[in-house]
From Swiss-Prot:
Pfam families recorded: Acetyltransf_1
Residue segments, region Disordered: 121-146, 371-392
Protein name, as recorded: Uncharacterized protein DDB_G0283377
Biased composition (Polar residues): 382-391
GO MF: acyltransferase activity, transferring groups other than amino-acyl groups
Composition bias, Low complexity: 121-143
Amino acid sequence: MAALILRTLLDNNVFSSSDYIHTIKDPLSTSMVEVSGNPQSCGVSEAFSSPSLKKADVSLTFGSSQEISYAAMSAPLNADTSRIPDEIAPTDVNKTELDLSTNNFGVPLADVVLPSSSSTTLSPSIVSEQQQQQQQQQQQQQQAISSEEIITSKGGIKSGAGELPFSIVYGSAFSKTPEIVSFQQPTQKQINDFLQMKSDATRVVTSDGYIFREIFNPDHDDGFKQALEMYGSSFFEPTEPGKNHLHTLCNRGLYRMMVMEDDKGLVLACAFIVEVHAYKSYHMDYLAVRPGIRGGGLGGKFFKQLTTHLRNEQKYLIITFESEPKLVPWYLRMSCLHLNVVSDQVTYENGETFFWWLLVVPLGKIIDDGSDADTDSDSEHPTSAPSTTAPNYALPLSLTEKQRNRSYILYNESGVSYEFNQQTINEIAQYLLTFMSDAKK
């Protein structure tokens, strides 16, 4: 009967689309109820379907905390069930959803309010006291189900005595990174196992046998501990955050963390990335290579794999980062664009001034003067970058007026385009100075 009511809701456009499929386990049988629809329109907290029930009790949650229970008598399939009470008109979604795509749950787990035995409200005028007691027992049994075994592979879930308290979905057609939808508060072990699965999903073995992956669980990933030590050997206080401070910033969700390892799990290079939503870009705040192997080309291989990983997300179109003057020629060889934008500068007591530059890597193709030139980091000779000849970086880079005012139209395979020039990158630089200064406090 629950399936009948839910189908009726679909027929009346309570769910506006069918791109979302949700499966709920019947606590009285092995049958499953599939709820199709748009999660932005309606959230279903419980639905029961069993031959032993005379009624189908469906609890619908709308708005912030309003919960409405709707019980309908069994009816033939051809019965007129198109009339739904006006008070069940959906207004907003209120389902507990933990988005782990960036290691930022959105809300602290301790603050998540999850369904309990008291969350299903039944009308006394319709449902007998015996049915209320029976339903409470069913919910208690369902919550007592043990699920010690967790996800065992990228594509499936293995449970112990029953269903897991959450299901795995994939967020978009472009992303293979899984997300988690929770109906009960998961244990810390389940969260750790899931985040490890997410990291494994990003794992890529390069042609040289190195392993590139993204870290989602800083406190329980040995790769992060190694990356933190590598950061400490490359960036120093007081101009940069200390290791403990950086660790705190990662736990806050400020950074995405990428590493490259050998086959024994030794981290050889790492990067800390910030997503700049306002400008459709990523900002690479820190990149480090393990001391002792610098200068051997490993940094370039890591940078290439990093930009490939970000480009495949088809989420943002450019990656920006600051660079010390002496490193600018290396970044230009990596197909970076130098648009003469100073991201920061410092003047020492002796009067000497050093500049930091905001360089750009297009994560897509550039349309320039009617041409379609790919500007990936694997391009041997970038068509849009200035000469790699090292100029005098004690002063701003001298470019022609055409280069200074040059605009770039960038697009990726998803069809999204973005136009930027020196002025746009200068706006990003000013934004980052303010944003990162506040975020690192």
